[in-house]
Amino acid sequence: MAQTTLSHPTAPVSLEAAPALPTKRDALLSLGARCSLPVILLLAVGFVAPLIAIFAYSFAKPRTFEVFRSFTLVNYAEIFNGSNTVWLSFLWSLGFAFATCALLAVIAYPIAYGLNRVFGKWSSLVSILFVFPLFVSENVRLYGWVLFFIKNGVLDGTLKMLGFEGGPQILFQPPMILAGMLYVYLPFMLFPMTLGLAMVPRDLIDAARDLGANRWQIWREVEVPLAMPGILIGMLLTFVLGIGAVAEAKILGGQSVIVISHDIEIAFTYSQNWPLGSALAVVVTIFIGALTLAVFSRLDLDRLLGRR
């Protein structure tokens, strides 16, 4: 009996090699990596290198420039000395920064809400009005405040000319410093907050309203949580700028308040004590860096940048 064999068709075998997996070298030579090289170089030269230099100087002997010939903790010991007034300056800076954040959050929120929901076609014009002062030097704007509020200045002279006793003497006092910081840093709180509110879908607000939520519940449970990334970024920017503010304290406050940035400036210039100034800068940088990491750990940057 003849045996029959069944032959099964076989698929043609491709002789082409499978595409190789991308290697680290390919990743380094990718278009995105090449395009980011100028930014990386700029950050390395303009940001990382100065930080390393400041950190190295903080361990040098006081009033010397011998960075690599000596190592001492005297500068940090002087900072953490209980009798050092630098902590009072640091507390003033913290107080101004926190007060600026809190007040600007209250001031900027209605404006940001108006830019998103109320102003309509006028939103661009209103935004330009807030951006335009940034094209003028901060010192010029603050000296304009001095000319306006100083004794026999614009306000005081005008009131006397009209027969009144004159304007209030509010210049060179802490409240005036805070007012100047509110004026200068308002855009840095406003625009991130506007971006955060723009991320709130109108459908969710309409759905919450249809389900019986009142205006307070919608604001508390829908708008604020979804807009929180933009609000936190605005508060972080304002706080970092506020804790490093020196022009407002010097121009609007005179010598009534000494902030930490002023102490650092004096150490580097008048006292010529670069190691102490570097140690102060390192302490402030570590504090701001820790705060920044804490804030960014609560942010969804992918959602904020529109990636998902």
Can you annotate each of these PLM segments?
Residues 211-212, 225:
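Glycine/proline-centered hinge or cleavage motifs at structural transition points of membrane proteins
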Residues 31-64, 79-198, 222-246, 253, ...:
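Membrane-water interface segments at the C-terminal ends of transmembrane alpha-helices
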Residues 71-81:
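A short amphipathic helical element positioned immediately N-terminal to and/or at the very start
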Residues 64-70, 147, 246-274, 308:
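Glycine-rich helix-loop "coupling/hinge" segments at transmembrane-helix boundaries
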Residues 69-72, 152, 196-206, 215-217, ...:
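Transmembrane helix boundary and interhelical loop/hinge segments in multi-pass membrane proteins
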Residues 19-33:
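Cytosolic juxtamembrane amphipathic/interface segments immediately preceding
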